[in-house]
Design a protein with these regions (language model features):
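Intrinsic low-complexity, repeat-rich intrinsically disordered segments enriched
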Residues: 1-70, 96, 101-103
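Surface-exposed coil/turn segments at beta-strand junctions on protein surfaces, enriched
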Residues: 2, 14-16, 88, 152, ...
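Short, surface-exposed charged micro-motifs
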Residues: 8-10, 30, 83-85, 147-149
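Extended, loop-rich substrate-binding clefts of extracytoplasmic carbohydrate-active enzymes
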Residues: 59-88
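Extracellular jelly-roll beta-sandwich "head" domains, especially the C-terminal globular C1q domain
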Residues: 76-83, 98-191
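Phosphate-centric recognition/catalysis
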Residues: 93
Length: 191
């Protein structure tokens, strides 16, 4: 529309082109990109020396089902408190949730929460950890707290107990009761 400054562009099937826009771009609908494509931030004049990518090529939100287990024997999860939320932006995944059991089942020894929505990246820089924001029904020593760390190249977090004199030890099934529960929230790098 030459009189109002608007431009309509139609590109034929199979065509490839680049449009350069000097002003703002306003879109009334979704911007849909082909798989593996994204928003390129290559105009960054001074990227960090460790920069490995400038394309935002993934965004996703959803739910994940966590299970407290010793790796072989899952505890019975409370149906209302076994699902958490996640948001994935690029390769950074943020998960939250409250995980509540109704029975220990046959679990023994070190326990973990399985079911993370994406595999944690497989390198030492990908280790991540956190502390439980809330917990009930736990049989840990007074003054101790529950923490955790994500296992690289896997989809679970190790539960740990932090004590002033003992440091960090793997949380045992015996330190969790039938109605034990914790709330967690943390971010990790996906593989």
């Amino acid at each position: 529309h030459a009189t109002d400054g608007e431009v309509d562009v139609t590109i034929g099937a199979g065509a490839s082109s680049t449009a350069t826009i000097a002003g703002d771009l306003s879109v009334a609908g979704d911007v849909i990109m082909a798989d593996g494509k994204g928003i390129d931030f290559a105009a960054d004049a001074s990227p960090s020396a460790g920069m490995t990518a400038e394309i935002l090529d993934d965004y996703e939100t959803g739910t994940w089902d966590g299970v407290v287990t010793d790796g072989t024997n899952p505890m019975t999860m409370h149906g209302g408190y076994d699902t958490g939320y996640y948001t994935k932006v690029g390769n950074l995944v943020t998960v939250t949730g409250r995980f509540y059991t109704t029975s220990l089942g046959s679990a023994s020894g070190d326990i973990k929460i399985t079911g993370l929505p994406f595999t944690i990246a497989n390198n030492g820089a990908a280790y991540t950890s956190g502390g439980a924001g809330h917990g009930d029904g736990l049989a840990i020593t007074a003054g101790h707290s529950v923490s955790f760390y994500g296992q690289i190249n896997n989809t679970y977090i190790h539960l740990t107990v932090w004590g002033a004199t003992t440091g960090v030890t793997g949380m045992q099934a015996s330190e969790w009761t039938a109605d034990g529960n914790i709330m967690i929230g943390f971010s990790y790098r996906a593989a």
